[in-house]
Amino acid sequence: MPALSPDSPAPNSPAPDSPAHQILRDVFGYGAFRAGQEEIVATLLAGTHALVVMPTGSGKSLCFQIPALVQGGLTVVVSPLVALMEDQVAALKLAGVAADTINSSRSYEVNAATWRRSAAGEVRLLYLAPERLMTERMVDALHRLPVTLIAIDEAHCISRWGPSFRPEYEALSRLGALFPETPIAALTATADAATRNDIADKLFDGKGRTFVTGFDRPNIRLAVEVRRDAKRQLLEFVGARSGQCGIVYCLTRKKTDETAAFLAANGIRALPYHAGMDKADRNRNQDLFMTEPGVVMVATIAFGMGIDKPDVRLV
């Protein structure tokens, strides 16, 4: 499938006074689409599947959120992380959008109330984890509703070609057969050519359009330093950026705890995050990282996917 260059024309794009442009301006507060967004929106509104590869921070979510609001009905959004679902729902609600989520962090009563609102047509975007979406009960329930779009965030998780493969995502390959009349938007910031082909084949048998607007982030600088005294080098690196938000990755849980304690003992506001921690402690540390300045998260690879924080200055 051909990729879209950032400078490609968009002959089927919404007109400047179209509902898509009005929602972009009035709901989300943007005067114009970014490169690629306009044609992706038009593609989904035309009922065509789309694989979208765009850098982080480039507005991937708008590519499905705007069609969701233009065409009505219910858009189902698949996301791998509860924290990401909650963040996106909160942001949409602030913009006045009827969005909600059913997830494992919420009580049965809250989830049941969300479903009742969804079934009554009061929710426009419903965020679900892949394992919840693909249950027989949920699929049957959604078949009774006007599902007009399915969006899959972090779509690279479905591909065995990539390092981020998640088994629960593999079940999403049945979506095309289960919802044959519903366009699917697959979105990722991380997919080489082999991974892109794998995603498109699994989600819509390759029958869709692929949009690649590039991977380069010119505001990111990569540097390599020879390891001599790792702890001293780390402290100097982080300390030289005092008050800035960052992430330090470690290979093991033990090393994560030790490094966080070391940095904290040296005046750095460092917090640990790994899968071996109590869930409440993990969530508390993530909330502090997301909401307060100058926090350095010391973590395993359990942390990071879907984190939307504009002031991260070091990794």
Feature map (PLM): residue ranges:
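Hydrophobic positions on the alpha1 helix immediately C-terminal to the Walker A/P-loop
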Residues: 63, 67
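Helicase motor core with emphasis on the C-terminal RecA-like subdomain
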Residues: 2-6, 14-27, 31-35, 39-51, ...
